[in-house]
Design a protein with these regions (language model features):
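Short hydrophobic core segments
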Residues: 10-12, 218-230, 364
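Extreme N-terminal leader/targeting segments of oxidoreductases
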Residues: 1-8, 27, 396, 401
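Helix-loop-beta segment of a Rossmann-like dinucleotide-binding subdomain
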Residues: 90-106, 128-182, 287-291, 350-351
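Active-site substrate-recognition segment that forms the wall
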Residues: 20-28, 37, 49-50, 92-97, ...
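C-terminal catalytic lobe of FAD-dependent flavoproteins
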Residues: 315-404
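A conserved short coil-to-beta-strand element within the FAD-binding core of flavoproteins
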Residues: 188-210
Length: 404
C-alpha cells in the first residue's frame, strides 16, 4: 500500500468545526485533507443559529464556561472579514447578522427570576466584560416586545440584549470550505485543501496516523477528529472516560405572509423554545430527544415544537410551513465539550451540544493549531478529552432553549 497521498493534517468531519479547522490550517501553510461522509442529521446544517454570549442555562455562571462562550462569540468578528475577503460572492448579512436578542418571560415567577439573574449579571462593567456584552440590557414591556414581534402573546416582559447575532450554519460552513480552497489556490507554497468524500476510519495500530476512506489510505502528520455526534470508526481505542451521545433536535421553519423578518431580534425563553427571523422565514425550535442516530422528522417532534411556538407566539398560526430540519447534537456525558489531544498525532473536538454554531469556529481553529504544533490556550484546559468526568451540565427536555 505505498504511494498513499500525504498531508500535514487530515480533518475528519466537514461541519462547522472541521470547516473552520480547514481554513485555519491552510492559512498556516498546511496541506489539508478534509474527509466527510455527509451523513443525515449533521447538526451544523440544521442548527437554528443563535450566536449569543449570554447563556440561559447549562452552568452559565461558571467563569471558565462563560469565558469560552465569550471568546468564541468574539471570534466571529475576526473570522467573518476573512471569509468575506476570500469568498466575496457570499459576503453580506445573509450568512451572519447582529440582530440582538429578546429574552422573554410570562408572569411565571421562576421565568422572571431567570431574567432578573441575567440582568444582575450584566448590570456592572465587570459582568458585561466577562460576557463580552458592550451595553447593559434594556428592560422591555409587552408593547415594546410586540413592536419587534407582533405575533407574540401580549403578557410578556423581558430584556433586550444587543450583542447577539444569528447565523445560517450551512451557509457559513460552505463558505469556510470555499475560503480554504481559495486560500490554497491563491497562496500555494505547499498549502491547500483536498475535500475527500466518504466515511473515514482511523488506522488501528496507534502508531501511524493513517486514515482509510473506503479502500484508499491517506497519510498525515496529524489527524483532527471533528465528527460531531458520530464516533470516528477506530476512535474506540482512545478509551476516554467521557462518552458522547447524539441528541436529536427538530427545528421547524415557517413563512409569514408579509415576510420581511430578517432584521427581527432573536426571541429566547427559559423553557418555551425560541424564534429567529431570517430574510425568508421564521425558525422555531427545538426538540431535545435521546433517540440515538434516528434523524427522522416525526409527527410528535413537529407537534411539540409548534405547540410551544404557538403558545409563545399565537400570531404564527397563519404562517405557512416551509420545512423541518433535524440535527443530531453531540452531547457529552458531563455536558461540556471535548477539545484536545487524545493520542499521539490525534486530536478531537466534539460534545458541543446545542452550542455548535457558537463555539465551533474558534474551537476548530484552536484544535487544529494545537495539532500542527501550537499550544492550546490554558483557558481550555478544563475541556480536555482526558479529564475526569464532571457532574452533568445539561439534561434532557422536550423543548430545548439556549444557543441551538
Amino acid at each position: 500500500m505505498s504511494g498513499a497521498p500525504t498531508y500535514d493534517v487530515i480533518i475528519i468531519g466537514a461541519g462547522i468545526v472541521g470547516a473552520s479547522a480547514a481554513l485555519a490550517a491552510v492559512r498556516m501553510g498546511a496541506k489539508v485533507a478534509l474527509v466527510d461522509a455527509r451523513l443525515a442529521g449533521r447538526a451544523s446544517d440544521a442548527g437554528a443559529g443563535i450566536v449569543s454570549p449570554v447563556a440561559l442555562d447549562r452552568g452559565e455562571a461558571r467563569p471558565a464556561w462563560t469565558s469560552v462562550i465569550t471568546r468564541c462569540v468574539d471570534h466571529y468578528r475576526k473570522l467573518l472579514p476573512i471569509v468575506d475577503a476570500l469568498d466575496p460572492a457570499g459576503a453580506g448579512s445573509a450568512t451572519f447578522r447582529q440582530v440582538g436578542e429578546l429574552v422573554v418571560a410570562r408572569s411565571d415567577r421562576e421565568e422572571q427570576a431567570t431574567i432578573a439573574a441575567i440582568r444582575d449579571r450584566l448590570s456592572t462593567e465587570t459582568g458585561r466584560q466577562a460576557h463580552g456584552v458592550s451595553v447593559s440590557p434594556t428592560d422591555v414591556d409587552a408593547s415594546e416586545i410586540r413592536k419587534y414581534w407582533p405575533e407574540l402573546r401580549e403578557d410578556l416582559v423581558g430584556l433586550f440584549i444587543a450583542d447577539v447575532g444569528r447565523v445560517v450554519g450551512s451557509r457559513l460552513t460552505d463558505r469556510l470550505i470555499t475560503s480554504a480552497a481559495r486560500w490554497g489556490q491563491d497562496h500555494g507554497q505547499g498549502s491547500g485543501l483536498t475535500v475527500v468524500p466518504g466515511l473515514a476510519r482511523l488506522g488501528s495500530d496507534r502508531v501511524t496516523t493513517d486514515v482509510w476512506v473506503g479502500h484508499d489510505r491517506l497519510s498525515a502528520g496529524t489527524v483532527l477528529v471533528a465528527t460531531g455526534a458520530w464516533p470516528a470508526p477506530g476512535s474506540e481505542m482512545f478509551g476516554l472516560g467521557i462518552s458522547v451521545r447524539p441528541v436529536r433536535g427538530q427545528i421547524v421553519h415557517l413563512r409569514l405572509p408579509n415576510g420581511a423578518t430578517g432584521d427581527r431580534p432573536v426571541v429566547n425563553t427559559t423553557g418555551a423554545g425560541y424564534l429567529l427571523g431570517f430574510d425568508d422565514r421564521v425558525v422555531v425550535g427545538a426538540t431535545h430527544e435521546d433517540v440515538g442516530f434516528d434523524a427522522r422528522v416525526t409527527a410528535g417532534g413537529q407537534h411539540a415544537v409548534l405547540a410551544a411556538a404557538l403558545e409563545l407566539a399565537p400570531g404564527l398560526a397563519g404562517a405557512g410551513f416551509v420545512e423541518t430540519r433535524v440535527g443530531l447534537r453531540p452531547v457529552s456525558s458531563d455536558g461540556l465539550p471535548l477539545v484536545g489531544v487524545v493520542a499521539p498525532g490525534i486530536s478531537l473536538v466534539t460534545g458541543l451540544g446545542a452550542w455548535g454554531l457558537t463555539l465551533g469556529p474558534l474551537l476548530g481553529q484552536l484544535a487544529v493549531e494545537e495539532a500542527l504544533g501550537h499550544r492550546l490556550p490554558d483557558w481550555l484546559n478544563f475541556l480536555s478529552p482526558t479529564r475526569t468526568p464532571a457532574v452533568a451540565h445539561e439534561t434532557s427536555a422536550t423543548i430545548h432553549t439556549g444557543a441551538a
